[in-house]
Amino acid sequence: MEEPLGSPPAALSALEKNVAELTVMDVYDIASLVGHEFERVIDQHGCESIARLMPKVVRVLEILEVLVSRHHVAPELDELRLELDRLRVERMDRIEKERKHQKELELVEDVWRGEAQDLLSQIAQLQEENKQLMTNLNHKDVGFSEEEFQKQEGMSERERQVMKRLKEVVDKQRDELRAKDRELGLKNEDVEALQQQQTRLMKINHDLRHRVTVVEAQGKALIEQKVELEADLQTKEQEMGSLRAELGKLRERLQGEHSQNGEEEEAEIQPQPDGEESISDAEKAALDLKDPNRPRFTLQELRDVLHERNELKSKVFLLQEELAYYKSEEIEEENRIPQPPPITHPRTSPQPESGIKRLFSFFSRDKKRLANTQRPTHIHESFGQWAITQRDDGYTEQGQEALQHL
């Protein structure tokens, strides 16, 4: 029996993985390995030996598939739970603030009601006294003296003053309640303005940090360029020193040759120091032309090239920083997109067939065919074909359908 290439090693690697790292495709690899083991048992002991075991194994693999798929969904659920907890905490804080405000209003209202009740009780008492006095006046035939009449007028005047004072207190408390409401509205507006200012300051702080990083990077680049220029300057100075030494040697050699040629040439050379310098300059130019490492540019041209290179480097660095900044903003905007609500599956919908059942359906058909024909050769051919097609197409069609159902 020929086994399909690539399936057992993949299954073995899936078995060696950590439990938290398993995927649905690893479960399918394990199912393929179990199918191979079933095939070997059928070859050795027949189909009846695993007829009762196979449905249980299929059920266990289905449970494993569901658990693995849920494990991959767990991080997203944790994030949603954290967001829900945060919203609940904010809601509880808001409710607590409203409750405190309501309690304050209730306390003020209770105080006002108590004072109003006291004043009403005083009014009722005064009215009762007034009624008693009126009844006494009706039952008594004795006429009131002028002093008693003035006393009665004083009592009625006192009642009017009490009523006036009560009205003033009620109006004052009503004005205080309105002022408290206006003050609360102003406080809420101040809080909203402070929140907006906080967000604006956070954005400004982020931009300033970005600029500071850019400036620091530019400073580092300038320091590196300074070090490079200093190193180049040192090398140039060393080269100039070596050239000066060679020039001195050449001058000494020329002077020795001229001294050997005779006194006449020495006499001609001594009154013409400018000519010697011109000859030495010409020899130096000839020597430089023969030197393969002679400088091709002037010092000003070299400085211009280095300055242009530094400017281009700084521009490239700024463009890279801006590109990274815009990419981070796009990522933040994508993360701010509201996530769709979780899909609720109705309980009445029938449970779809899992990928494990589809994986073993072909093998179960081969098992029935083996029981009918009693020829093991058909099992070899069918299971080989099943293993190859399952390994090739299991990740594309059946696996994807199983994932969609889950």
Swiss-Prot record:
- Superkingdom of origin organism: Eukaryota
PROSITE patterns, per the entry: RH1, RH2
Composition bias, kind Acidic residues: at what positions? Answer: 262-280
- Entry's SUPFAM superfamilies? RILP dimerisation region
Q: Name one GO molecular function term.
A: protein dimerization activity
Task: Return the annotated region ranges for Disordered.
Answer: 255-280, 330-354
- Per UniProt, residues of the RH2 domain are 294-359
Any Gene Ontology CC annotation:
plasma membrane
Subcellular locations according to the entry: Cytoplasm, Cytosol; Cell projection, Cilium; Cytoplasm, Cytoskeleton, Microtubule organizing center, Centrosome, Centriole
One GO biological process from the UniProt record? epithelial cell morphogenesis
Q: Report what the Swiss-Prot or TrEMBL entry states about this protein's PTMs.
A: S-nitrosylation is required for the interaction with GAPDH.
The RH1 domain is annotated at 10-97
Instruction: Spell out which residues are annotated as carrying S-nitrosocysteine.
Output: 47
Pfam families tied to this protein? RH1 (PF09744), RILP (PF11461)
Keywords from the named record:
Cell projection, Cilium, Coiled coil, Cytoplasm, Cytoskeleton, Phosphoprotein, Protein transport, S-nitrosylation, Transport
Establish whether keyword Protein transport is in the entry: yes
> Which protein family is it in?
Belongs to the RILPL family.
Protein name per its UniProtKB record: RILP-like protein 1
